[in-house]
Design a protein with these regions (language model features):
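Active-site catalytic microenvironments in core metabolic enzymes, especially phosphate/sugar-handling
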Residues: 1-175
């Protein structure tokens, strides 16, 4: 089993029979852009910590991401985030800062106006916001030439990757 494999490797590293693999790291960058579709308390704490470290927070119009204004809202966000990046800022474009963010209720109202409720509304939200964030991220990266980006949220990350044409990921270093 993999548990036995991990235990053996750890033991062999302790006894000096094998050396631990070299730690891979990413080269530092001056700026990064992050799209966040997670409303979890953990993500909210991470956003708060990033703000303390100098990231500019860009709250997104999530209701606009799920209704017929979607294309205009995303294109406007691309322009606004690019303007912040052009000023040398690292940016987190986010759909919420925790489970109590008022945008969650606003988004659900927008979906209810389209006749969507319950699980259908939840899945529609994940897809529309995720795809919108993917479009936003791709647009910002193309316009600015930034070399590093990140995304948060399980469903969000899936749709962002899909929207950006990502077909595979490879872990090369611990996070």
């Amino acid at each position: 089993s993999s548990g036995l494999e991990y235990a053996l490797v750890a033991y062999w590293e302790q006894t000096g029979e094998v050396s631990p693999p070299p730690m891979l790291t990413a080269d530092p960058v001056e700026q990064i852009v992050v799209v966040s579709g997670s409303c979890s308390p953990v993500t909210a704490d991470q956003i708060d910590a990033a703000e303390v470290e100098g990231f500019v927070l860009f709250p997104l119009d999530t209701a606009g991401f799920v209704d017929d204004r979607r294309d205009r809202v995303v294109e406007r966000a691309i322009l606004d985030v690019c303007a912040l990046v052009s000023k040398g800022k690292s940016v987190i474009a986010h759909t919420g800062r925790g489970p109590d963010d008022p945008r969650i209720a606003e988004t659900m109202v927008a979906l209810e106006q389209q006749g969507l409720t319950g699980e259908t509304a939840r899945m529609t939200t994940a897809e529309r916001i995720g795809r919108g964030l993917g479009h936003l991220l791709r647009g910002v990266l193309e316009e600015t030439g930034l070399r590093r980006a990140a995304t948060t949220g399980g469903d969000t990350s899936y749709y962002v990757a899909k929207e950006m044409g990502v077909t595979a990921l490879e872990a090369v270093a611990p996070m």
